[in-house]
């Protein structure tokens, strides 16, 4: 088994596409997060900014997570100091949004009532809330970021959230005995 970080692709087909992903696609995806309020939602949840929660879905938090995952894998293949610093700034917003017990879903923390059809009136109330889906993408991003950089900043956020999930869900008395509603947290 060869770790992908030890593979160097140097051909006329994939190399330009990988470079385009690093220099165009990833920055464009992050700009969309900025434009559409994804980062603002974390800043609001973390008390760093005032304002209304933006977006149309309870799972909008996954957009930054998925892009962090891809950007981290890109960093692992070709280091980019600017991208690394940008990831640090985004991760700081995510960490600020995490509640003290590890909970992290911005539309719930921000009490976005117009999305309450998705999440209800309190944590873990509705199966279609996508809270665990959000967590699953957080975990994948955190692992990718840690593998790429060795930094624990997002990994520590993910572990704190996973510890909460393990306390809340399970077979024991007092725990929730429900499916996740959308696969990914179990990965």
Regions found by a protein language model. Name each.
Residues 1-187:
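Glycan-recognition and catalytic cores of secretory/periplasmic carbohydrate-active enzymes
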């Amino acid at each position: 088994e060869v770790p992908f970080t030890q593979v160097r692709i140097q051909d006329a087909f994939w190399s330009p596409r990988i470079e385009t992903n690093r220099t165009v696609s990833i920055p464009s995806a992050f700009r969309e997060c900025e434009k559409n309020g994804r980062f603002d939602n974390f800043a609001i949840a973390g008390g760093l900014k005032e304002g209304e929660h933006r977006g149309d879905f309870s799972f909008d938090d996954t957009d930054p997570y998925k892009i962090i995952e891809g950007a981290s894998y890109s960093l692992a293949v070709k280091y980019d100091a600017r991208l690394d610093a940008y990831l640090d700034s985004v991760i700081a917003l995510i960490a600020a949004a995490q509640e003290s017990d590890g909970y992290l879903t911005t539309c719930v923390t921000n009490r976005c009532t117009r999305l309450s059809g998705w999440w209800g009136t309190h944590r873990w109330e509705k199966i279609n809330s996508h809270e665990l889906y959000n967590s699953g993408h957080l975990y994948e991003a955190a692992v990718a970021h840690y593998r790429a950089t060795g930094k624990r900043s997002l990994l520590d956020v993910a572990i704190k959230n996973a510890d909460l999930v393990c306390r809340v869900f399970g077979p024991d008395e007092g725990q929730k005995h429900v499916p996740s509603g959308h696969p990914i947290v179990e990965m």
